[in-house]
């Protein structure tokens, strides 16, 4: 009985694998081999560039809207109160 169940499961797995491997997916506008006809791509591009879009493109990018970053080196940090706390054992430049 165990042998028949094992053969049945193997046969079912074989059918599932063959079904997936032998079938070919055909999408609208696609030819066998994954190629598309040029006319349909051109029509799709024309449809996308209708000219009367509802979405507006923002004038500034998000990076331009951020405040600028000020990099502070040791010379600029002379009066900065945390300089002594960050480098307590520093004696100077060598």
Curated annotation (Swiss-Prot):
Q: List the disulfide bonds.
A: none
Where does the source fall among the domains of life?
A: Eukaryota
Pfam families reported for this sequence: GnRH (PF00446)
**Which terms are listed as keywords in the entry?**
Amidation, Cleavage on pair of basic residues, Hormone, Pyrrolidone carboxylic acid, Secreted, Signal
In alphabetical order, the GO MF annotations are:
gonadotropin hormone-releasing hormone activity; gonadotropin-releasing hormone receptor binding
Compartments it resides in: Secreted
Note the InterPro entries from the entry.
Answer: GnRH (IPR002012), Gonadoliberin (IPR019792)
**Modified residue annotations for Glycine amide:** 33
Residues annotated with Pyrrolidone carboxylic acid modification: 24
Q: Does the keyword Signal apply?
A: yes
Indicate the secretion signal residues: 1-23
Keyword Secreted present in the record's keywords: the answer is: yes
Q: Name one GO cellular component term.
A: extracellular space
Q: What does this protein do?
A: Stimulates the secretion of gonadotropins.
Question: Which family is it part of?
Answer: Belongs to the GnRH family.
Protein name, entry field: Progonadoliberin-3
